[in-house]
Design a protein with these regions (language model features):
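ABC ATPase nucleotide-binding domains
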Residues: 1-81
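Non-catalytic connector elements of ABC transporters
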Residues: 89, 100-201
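Generic secondary-structure boundary/loop-capping signal
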Residues: 10, 17-19, 44-47, 64, ...
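Short glycine-rich loop/turn motifs that provide flexible caps or phosphate-binding loops at active sites
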Residues: 61, 67, 86, 95, ...
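Residues located in well-ordered beta-strands
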Residues: 69, 81, 95-97, 139-143
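C-terminal boundary and immediately downstream tail of ABC-type ATPase nucleotide-binding domains
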Residues: 75-99, 124, 185
Length: 201
């Protein structure tokens, strides 16, 4: 009916059931590509944001925390808020101290983290950036298990009760009560200044 220069979408899929939401998400993306009209899509659903956006703005209390492509924001979150919002399951956060280029937590250390900063930090590790290892840094006991076929979402505890999540391939057999030793995939973690919540690495 009209030929606007921009479309504004305000959570158009929020009241749909899961299957219809996926179908409509694909249809919106196809139509947008076909028509070539700039579109602004507001959503609280990070899957919608990641799959629909060419450029993504993560907003916290009216302030843009980060602007970039979905992959840039997933791989290089600039704050604890962004890191926790993008990614499902959510990134794991562990309190630590950075002292003389060594990251020190209650249960493990990470050496050779080159930084001029010394003080309290938060280490962020995505559940998919872990792998089983006899020489791993992180020990968890499986408390909850979500078996999705293609992968397993495994929940346990570290540091005397802090919840921790690990995503494993679906062909790995895991049972409740199993004890797992995990290592962080090389350099696949974030370090945030605890006072400012901003990224250090």
């Amino acid at each position: 009916v009209r030929n606007p220069k921009i479309f504004l979408f305000d959570e158009p899929l929020s009241n749909l059931d899961a299957l219809l939401r996926i179908k409509m998400r694909l249809e919106i993306k196809k139509l947008q590509r076909k028509m070539g009209v700039t579109s602004i899509f507001v959503t609280h659903d990070q899957v919608e944001a990641m799959t629909l956006a060419d450029r993504l703005a993560v907003i916290n209390n009216g302030i843009i925390e980060q602007l970039g492509t979905p992959i840039e924001i997933y791989n290089n979150p600039q704050s604890v808020f962004v890191a926790g919002f993008i990614g499902s399951p959510q990134m794991n956060f562990i309190d630590a101290e950075l002292k003389n280029n060594i990251l020190i937590t209650d249960s493990f250390t990470i050496p050779n983290f080159l930084s001029d900063f010394n003080g309290d930090v938060i280490i962020g590790i995505r559940p998919e950036h872990l792998s089983p290892s006899n020489k791993g840094e992180i020990n968890i006991t499986v408390d909850l298990l979500e078996q999705l076929g293609s992968d397993n979402i495994i929940y346990g505890e570290i540091n005397g009760g802090k919840e921790f999540c690990y995503r494993s391939p679906g062909n790995i057999i895991v049972n409740l009560g199993d004890k797992l030793t995990l290592k962080i995939v090389e350099n696949q973690f974030c370090v945030f200044d605890k006072n400012t919540s901003k990224i250090l690495n």
